[in-house]
């Protein structure tokens, strides 16, 4: 129930029956106890090589403000976990590069590898070594296991050990699955 720019929320505008208002209040109270609320929505099948787990992760990552691609999101999550995300991003941008463009070229980005080397010299002897480490540590995968998917969702959404009450809305599921029993 995020407020609009004028401070009014959707719940304040809508004329809702008392029972519905009570349910929303209960939801808000539960959210306060469990790390907040989070919603993710998107269309299955867009950019995940016909892999339902990666398609779901793309949607969740995007909703959390992360890159949609698994390897890039895991890299950003690792930087955030180590507390060096802002430092690395600043170093990339100070070098005159766009963070998003460099992240897209993660394996060949001189500014990302150089920034990592400046922040943690134990990652490699030179930029070339750090690039190789990035390729090995964050490979571009074609699939993930169920456990890797669950772990990635938890890492993307949990904050301070709490997982928010989460709603995931998937559009075009029937079209995505079609008659493919592997997807079903």
Please annotate each region the language model reported:
Residues 1-15, 139-142, 154, 174-184:
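Signature of the SF2 helicase/ATPase Hel1-core->accessory helical subdomain module
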Residues 1-108:
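P-loop NTPase motor core
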Residues 2, 54-61, 151, 155, ...:
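A broad, structural surface signal
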Residues 23, 69-167:
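Mid-core helix/loop region of P-loop NTP-binding domains shared across ATPases and GTPases
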Residues 32-38, 130-131, 167-170:
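Surface-exposed beta-strand-to-loop junctions
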Residues 47-52, 126, 174-178, 184:
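Flexible loop/turn segments at secondary-structure boundaries
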Residues 161-181:
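Conserved P-loop NTPase "ATPase switch" module shared by AAA+ and STAND
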